[in-house]
A protein has these predicted regions:
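Noncatalytic, helix-rich "gating/capping" subdomain that lines the substrate-entry/channel surface
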Residues: 143-438
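Sec-exported extracytoplasmic/periplasmic mature domains
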Residues: 2, 23-31, 61-65, 90-94, ...
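Short, solvent-exposed loop/turn elements at domain surfaces
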Residues: 112-116, 239, 552
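Active-site-surrounding "flap" and adjacent substrate/cofactor-binding loops of secreted or lumenal enzymes
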Residues: 99-103, 107-168
Length: 726
């Protein structure tokens, strides 16, 4: 009751009162540890917290479950709704992690989450993400073993050793500083007209293979997947659209400090660097405002914009695009793709003498961002400092780690072959291929049983499955363009920078040769040592590199149910991408085409809208919620994957669905900083990892049956609200 002796049941419950009641109901809340400590909210305290709350309110606030408002205050006297109470209750379930019926993900993963850490050099940790670190270490060992002994000149091993040695030659890189790019920086600095700056841009493209403010390249032709199309791009935003529109002042200051640091490292005074950093920021913000939202870049209807060179030239009337096109080395083409016309128009407004200072600042900054890491350590340190300030993540690496990472990225085709020979089993390849074929049959059965799709559209969908190409482990043939790269050791006069430029030249030569030749659809989009998987709509294929086919996602000694909840979920997810809101716009040949009846597509769009609503606003960490619109394509894939792996498990005699569902939870266990969670919530087209477990499982009747989940439990949702597409 109240001090006056009354109970006052009709009074409005305030935020502070609700928090005190919460503490009393649970007998005191634990202090957050591990992942909860990293993602806790309100740990700085609230200046308007009422004194009367005493230790009870203090305990709740120190548990990290109170996010407060945008102004940084608690607003203790604000009224609390039933929805507010449910949100607080869900946060407590997550913090406690003691009941599968209330928060499955947190309960299954509690021991791991509470004891988790983030190793230096890793932005996110978890069984899935940690596998990337394991593979990186495996590849680094291959590289260091090769670099430790003499190699036969001209062999892949000799090039690996030479590149590694130049990265490790820190003393030489420090002594050289920005000398390798000084002539280009000077040329930018002395350009007095927009025409002169474009001449520098053309020179950069020809001599270094760099496009800094605009350029042409090749990409997939959405209308004919058997050919490439020329693509035009102009400078864009280095950060996310949300950053420029909604970023905090602290975040913006961190980015400006990073830009300023890069520019001072290139030889500018602090004052000049600060001024140019502001020019870069303003231009990027303008382009970002005119750009598509992140999820729109997956929509072929929005990004397939074909222009003639003369059409683009009208946007850039003060410069010669013909000169820039010639510098690209591409053969003439009357079809040029522009993925984001709004961003292009915003950038074009700077291509005149009035925008010269901004373009010069952009060009200089772009060079430094592109090749600064090949020069002295200051550029690497600046990046590490920014990452820590902006994302709350320590990406510090030893010189050996940096060298191995650079060699892995630049000589990936050589190392992919070596990785497969050392770390991949044919048994894993065979098991994955068998699982894929089984899933394809399950999908056919499920599609045939759909009650919202006509037979005509079903046959088209099944055709997409029948023609889907499967890539597992490694490619049938290996790329050879690196054989043409002139990679020299320090003793031969080679430097990290010169070797990078030589590799880029070889890659460009390969790209130019592809312009007027049929697309080789046996090419891989990923390296064998990549811990990821993908579906390509323009090839209608699924790719599962060797590195992902190992523990903890796949284990030859694990139960069938556990492998289904690990690698099975990922395989089924990629297959479903052929039928998400983006993949559904491509046919069996990888061409953008409408294979739907009008009525069926309308029904599909309604299904997708339901999926967006199912996820939208779902809170994962205090004050951090999911965007249904941003994540719709990945969520459709997740939901389809869950249906598929449950169907596969139910074909077993006496399937252990508890093992299956726990494996799903284990797969998506992850930890990172709160800043990174906030960043991913507005940029990542995947739902937060916790929702890839909980929100997906909440759509499965088998999940409720397995754990006896009933109304009133935290994981319960009414059957009529649960969504399903495939």
């Amino acid at each position: 009751g109240y001090p006056d002796g009354n109970l006052d049941l009709r009074g409005t419950l305030t935020r502070a009162q609700a928090l005190v009641m919460l503490d009393r109901a649970f007998g005191g809340l634990p202090a957050p540890v591990g992942d909860h400590a990293r993602t806790a909210a309100g740990m700085q305290g609230f200046s308007d917290a009422p004194v009367w709350g005493g230790e009870e309110l203090s305990r709740v606030l120190s548990s990290g479950i109170v996010a407060g408002e945008a102004d940084g205050l608690l607003h203790p006297d604000a009224p609390v709704t039933r929805e507010n109470l449910q949100t607080l209750l869900s946060r407590v379930y997550a913090l406690e992690g003691t009941n599968c019926k209330d928060d499955f993900y947190e309960t299954v993963n509690k021991t791991w989450l509470d004891s988790s850490d983030i190793p230096a050099g890793l932005s996110v940790n978890g069984p899935f993400y940690g596998l990337s670190l394991t593979v990186t270490e495996q590849v680094a060992k291959l590289i260091s073993d090769i670099a430790a002994k003499p190699q036969t000149p001209g062999t892949p091993e000799a090039k690996i050793k030479a590149l590694y040695d130049t990265v490790m030659d820190v003393e030489a890189r420090e002594a050289a500083g920005v000398a390798p790019i000084q002539e280009y920086l000077d040329a930018i600095e002395t350009a007095k007209t927009i025409s002169e700056l474009i001449d520098v841009e053309c020179r950069l493209q020809k001599e270094l293979g760099l496009s800094t403010i605009l350029g042409f390249g090749l990409t997939s032709d959405f209308e004919d997947s058997n050919r490439k199309v020329v693509a035009f791009s102009s400078f864009g935003a280095s950060m996310t659209k949300d950053f420029y529109e909604n970023g905090t002042q602290e975040q913006k200051d961190a980015y400006l400090a990073y830009l300023t640091k890069l520019l001072t490292l290139s030889g500018l005074s602090e004052q000049a660097a600060t001024e140019r950093a502001k020019l870069v920021y303003a231009a990027e913000a303008k382009v970002a405002k005119a750009s598509y939202d992140p999820q729109e870049y997956g929509d072929v209807d929005k990004i397939n914009n074909i222009y003639k060179l003369s059409d683009i030239q009208r946007q850039f009337s003060k410069i010669s695009l013909a000169k820039v096109y010639e510098a690209s080395g591409l053969a003439p083409s009357d079809r040029i793709l522009v993925t984001d016309p709004g961003a292009m128009r915003a950038a074009a407004s700077y291509f005149n003498d009035a925008g010269l200072a901004t373009l010069k600042a952009l060009s200089r900054t772009a060079i430094l961002m592109s090749v600064g890491g090949c020069l002295n350590q200051g550029f690497i340190e600046a990046s590490v400092e920014f990452t820590k300030a902006y994302y709350g993540i320590d990406m510090t690496q030893t010189t050996e780690q940096i060298a191995a990472q650079q060699v892995q990225g630049l000589l990936a085709d050589y190392l992919g072959r070596a990785y497969v020979e050392a770390h991949f089993s044919e048994k894993a390849k065979q098991d994955a291929e068998e699982m894929i074929h089984e899933f394809l049959e399950i999908y056919k059965t499920r599609i045939e049983a759909l009650d919202w799709m006509s037979d005509a559209t079903k046959q088209k969908a099944i055709c997409n499955l029948d023609t889907m190409k499967i890539k597992v482990g490694y490619p049938d043939s290996w790329e050879t363009y690196l054989d043409n790269a002139d990679i020299k050791s320090p003793s031969e006069g080679g430097t990290f920078f010169s070797n990078v430029i030589s590799i880029q030249a070889s890659a460009k030569e390969k790209t130019l040769a592809e312009q007027n030749t049929p697309v080789d659809k046996t090419d891989w989009l990923m390296e064998p040592f990549t811990v990821n998987a993908c579906y390509s709509a323009t090839s209608n294929d699924i790719t599962f590199p060797a590195a992902i086919l190992q523990k903890p996602l796949y284990d030859v000694n694990a139960s069938r149910e556990e492998n289904l909840g690990g690698i099975g979920y990922i395989i089924a997810h990629e297959i479903t991408h052929a039928f998400d809101n983006n993949g559904a716009k491509f046919d069996e040949n990888g061409n953008a085409a409408n294979w739907w009846t009008e009525q069926d597509y309308a029904a599909f769009q309604q299904k997708c809208l339901q999926v967006a609503n199912w996820y939208d606003g779902q809170e994962v960490y205090p004050g951090i919620a999911c965007s249904g619109a941003l994540t719709i394509s990945e969520n459709v894939a997740d939901l389809g994957a869950a249906k598929c792996i449950v169907a596969a498990a139910k074909k077993l005699d006496h399937p252990d669905l508890d093992k299956l569902f726990r494996a799903v939870a284990n797969t998506w266990a992850s930890t990172t900083s709160r800043q990174m969670r906030e960043y991913l919530a507005v940029t990542d087209v995947h739902a937060p990892d916790k929702l890839r477990c909980n929100r997906v499982l909440q759509t499965l009747p088998e999940f409720y049956t397995t754990y006896g989940i009933q109304p009133g439990d935290g994981m319960w949702t009414a059957p009529e609200t649960r969504v399903s597409v495939w």
